[in-house]
Design a protein with these regions (language model features):
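Interhelical loop/hinge segments that connect adjacent transmembrane helices in multipass membrane
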Residues: 1-5, 196-240, 279, 283-297, ...
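Membrane-proximal transmembrane or re-entrant/amphipathic helices at the cytosolic face
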Residues: 444-495
């Protein structure tokens, strides 16, 4: 692993850790100030307006690959044209679509909320659309920083934006409620857009101060790449947003609120691991041009590291579900704990498709990623409605988990077959002890869930200390620990 790749991976992980802390502080504050039902309204409205991302045309995601490729070829002027072309196109296309979507989304909301919560949802809808427009623009600059392999700049930018959101929420929410939170998001989007371009000019000096270098040839190439990504976006809209909408319909805004919190806990833990892996996208784009034979070895290495890190991390999440409920909701909530446990299992299976997913992005084989999202989206929408009609919010959650795992398994199987890796693809007997330890911890968390506010001190101490002790011992005797330590020591010696 090169020094730059390691630096980018560390920057991604630190950004995710800091961002998770800021997000959880925001959730705790909203829960305390407004309540879980208003958190659910906010979550569902944001998921609903994400339909506007169809106007993105896959450009914001494609920026990473094209900037990385053009820099690898020494075409820095063209890399700056990629940024401006994507930026100007999205400012116009998304800006034109948003006013048209507003009346359509306003007609959808009555099917999701009752009278009281409907008024709140309709009130924040326009603000959510403006916030999304700013966020999409900011995503172009963040993708440019990733393509320049300056992820430490992007990480600092995103964390600063999240801190700004929290500060504005503390200021505006007590005065204006959910509308104050919406204004805080607009302030965050404006900050990310302006500061993002300024930082990108440091990494790409050919970029002018203001976007003005639009190029049809660049756009045509990006649209060709973005077609598969855009299809992916379409089916992603049948995943998370549809799940939240179905939860609001069949379980009410409180169910959507608990799902939002539980899902974010798992996603932030997943992101700590996966964002380190995301650093390989520009690296893979370079390898695809220079040393394509190294891609399979890089994939195997990624999978082995993921198994070593993911299994104990997600087992610990499962065992500590009650502690997260107390942290975010202020008390032990059975609904939250159930959803967190289910999502830990689902996202824990999904995380192993990350090496295949990001390698495909780097090499341009994004069609297989699209297939995975098609499967997830179609299963989630169809099963979610069916199981939600029968079993309410729990049925929707189970459909979400089934869709997530199924789509991930298909992507892994196809990637390993294409590269002749077989079903193991990096898995080995060395992980057996770790798997057993994780199974013990999960069983312990299921039998004796952690209840910080009601458990006896001895039981609470056992619930907090035994899981990390068991997992830590298994990780200590795992051969991957020595290999990771060797990589770190070798890198330290080089620097």
């Amino acid at each position: 692993m090169s020094g730059r790749l390691a630096r980018n991976a560390v920057a991604n992980v630190l950004q995710t850790l800091a961002g998770a802390g800021l997000l959880f502080a925001l959730y705790r504050y909203i829960n305390k100030t407004l309540g879980v039902e208003q958190l659910g309204v906010w979550s569902v409205v944001l998921a609903t307006v994400s339909a506007s991302r169809l106007a993105d045309m896959g450009l914001s995601t494609g920026v990473i690959r094209f900037v990385a490729r053009d820099r690898a070829r020494g075409e820095l002027d063209r890399a700056s044209r990629v940024i401006d072309t994507a930026n100007l196109t999205l400012m116009a296309s998304v800006g034109a679509v948003l006013p048209l979507l507003h009346p359509l989304l306003a007609k959808l909301l009555p099917h999701l909320f009752d009278a009281v919560h409907l008024v709140q949802a309709q009130e924040i809808l326009p603000y959510a659309l403006v916030s999304l427009w700013l966020t999409i623009i900011a995503t172009v600059y963040q993708g440019g920083l990733d393509g320049c392999q300056r992820m430490e700049l992007r990480a600092g930018l995103v964390v600063a934006g999240q801190a700004l959101l929290l500060a504005f929420a503390f200021w505006l929410v007590p005065r204006y409620g959910l509308v104050g939170l919406a204004w805080a998001q607009i302030a965050q989007g404006l900050f990310l857009s302006v500061t993002g371009r300024l930082l990108l000019r440091r990494a790409l000096p050919h970029l002018p101060w203001l976007p003005r270098r639009w190029c049809w040839g660049v756009l045509r190439e990006m649209l060709g790449y973005g077609a598969s990504i855009q299809l992916t976006t379409l089916f992603m809209l049948l995943f998370d947003p549809v799940a939240k909408a179905l939860l609001a319909r069949f379980g009410g805004p409180a169910a959507a609120g608990y799902f939002e919190m539980a899902n974010q806990v798992v996603l932030k833990a997943r992101a700590v691991i996966v964002t380190g892996n995301q650093a390989v996208v520009p690296h893979v784009a370079v390898l695809a041009e220079s040393e394509p034979a190294r891609l399979a070895r890089l994939y195997r290495q990624n999978v082995r590291v993921l198994v070593f890190i993911t299994l104990p991390a997600f087992a610990l999440l499962f065992a500590w579900a009650g502690a997260f409920s107390w942290l975010l909701a202020g008390t032990y909530q059975r609904e939250f704990v159930f959803l967190l446990g289910l999502l830990v299992l689902a996202w824990g299976g999904n995380i192993f498709d990350a090496p295949a997913y990001f390698t495909n992005m780097g090499t341009g084989h994004v069609g297989w990623n699209t297939l995975s999202h098609v499967i997830m989206g179609a299963l989630n929408a169809s099963l979610g409605w069916l199981l939600g009609s029968w079993y309410g919010a729990h049925g929707v959650a189970f459909a979400y988990a089934i869709a997530l795992v199924t789509g991930s398994l298909v992507l892994i199987a196809v990637f390993q077959r294409r590269h002749g890796l077989g079903w193991r693809g990096g898995l080995a007997r060395e992980h057996l002890g770790l798997v057993v330890a994780c199974a013990v911890v999960v069983a312990f968390g299921w039998i004796e869930p952690l209840r910080p506010s009601t458990s006896r001190p001895a039981v609470l101490a056992a619930g907090l200390l035994l899981p990390p002790l068991v997992l830590g011992l298994a990780a200590w005797f795992h051969p991957m620990r020595r290999q990771l330590l060797g990589w770190l020591m070798a890198r330290e010696a080089r620097t």
